[in-house]
Regions:
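Asp-based, Mg2+/Mn2+-dependent phosphohydrolase catalytic module
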Residues: 2-32, 39, 43-44, 48-114, ...
Length: 166
């Protein structure tokens, strides 16, 4: 597909993504990054707002699947609590995990999106296979390297600033 560091849509949190907005964008399957998108790196416990959003989304017509580069057990335990499908060791920005998810659901790439907090993994990976990319603000910039990476992403965020959804 295309090599692009620019997200299709920018939001502050996945909790801003409603079934109505996703349907407007033509999205039937929302893939979610795990760490710093749904929960911080330091815990598997979502905020009350995130838990409420997950339950609302699970009762909608939008399919959800966690696609994470994280270790299997940590993600599977979380997803099991909410009845979420998950794909671990996704190797984003490479296409392995995203293509596995597309194959599992049988939904065309143009009707799918990947929401995540990293341009160099989530956005690039999604764009590379023709899936819409949704950049979310990281839940927690808890260390120097995450902060540095987010600073390096600022030029791309600036270029895509008109794609922000309030």
């Amino acid at each position: 597909m295309r090599l692009s560091f620019l997200p299709t849509v920018i939001v502050d949190s996945v909790t801003q993504l409603t079934p109505e907005l996703l349907k407007e964008l033509g999205i039937r399957l929302l893939m979610l990054d795990f760490d710093n998108t749904i929960v911080p790196y330091t815990t598997n416990v979502p905020t009350g707002e995130m838990e409420k959003w997950l339950k609302m989304m699970l009762s909608s017509e939008i399919q959800l699947c966690v696609v994470s580069n994280s270790k299997r057990d940590r993600v599977k335990i979380f997803c099991g609590q909410y009845g979420l499908d998950c794909i671990t060791h996704a190797k984003k920005p490479f296409s392995k995990g995203i293509k596995e998810c597309l194959g599992k659901y049988g939904i065309p790439a143009e009707n799918c999106a990947l929401a995540g907090d990293q341009i160099y993994t989530d956005t690039l990976g999604a764009n590379g296979v023709g899936v819409k990319s949704i950049l979310v603000k990281a839940i927690d910039n808890h260390n120097f390297w995450l902060k540095a990476r987010h600073v390096a992403e600022l030029p791309f965020i600036f270029c895509a600033r008109k794609r922000r959804v309030e």
